[in-house]
UniProtKB/Swiss-Prot annotation:
One of its GO terms (biological process) is translation. The keyword Methyltransferase does not apply. It comes from Synechocystis sp. (strain ATCC 27184 / PCC 6803 / Kazusa). GO terms for molecular function: rRNA binding; structural constituent of ribosome. Keywords: Ribonucleoprotein, Ribosomal protein, RNA-binding, rRNA-binding. Coiled coil: none annotated. This is Large ribosomal subunit protein uL23. GO terms for cellular component: cytosolic large ribosomal subunit. InterPro entries: Nucleotide-bd_a/b_plait_sf (IPR012677), Ribosomal_uL23-like (IPR013025), Ribosomal_uL23/eL15/eS24_sf (IPR012678), Ribosomal_uL23_CS (IPR001014).
Length: 101
């Protein structure tokens, strides 16, 4: 039994791409890192990336990043917990994160 996934919901699953030194080094292996919503599943993330960027995804690895303490004035709080997805693309496919550069 297959589940029909709404295209608008798929677009909302991807929060932002991660552009750190470690994530940039993974671009050489055709791997892209994204912050995704915590309730997103691997098949949904795969469908969202394929729909938004018109590429073929060969693998998705996910990890829940821990909450971090954040000081706001004299009060201590927490930054929200996020889920991070490392998406591996088919050889030859690529995502243009910075179209003007």
């Amino acid at each position: 039994m297959s589940k029909v996934i709404d295209q608008r919901r798929l677009a909302d699953l991807i929060i932002k791409p991660i552009v750190t030194e470690k994530a940039t080094l993974q671009l050489e292996d055709n791997k892209y890192v994204f912050d995704v919503r915590p309730e997103a599943t691997k098949p949904e993330i795969k469908a969202a990336i394929e729909l938004l960027f018109d590429v073929k995804v060969t693998g998705v690895n996910t990890a829940r990043m821990p909450r971090r303490k954040k000081r706001v004035g004299r009060f201590m709080g927490f930054k929200a917990q996020v889920k991070r997805a490392v998406v591996t693309l088919k050889e030859g496919d690529s995502i243009q994160l910075f179209p003007d550069v």
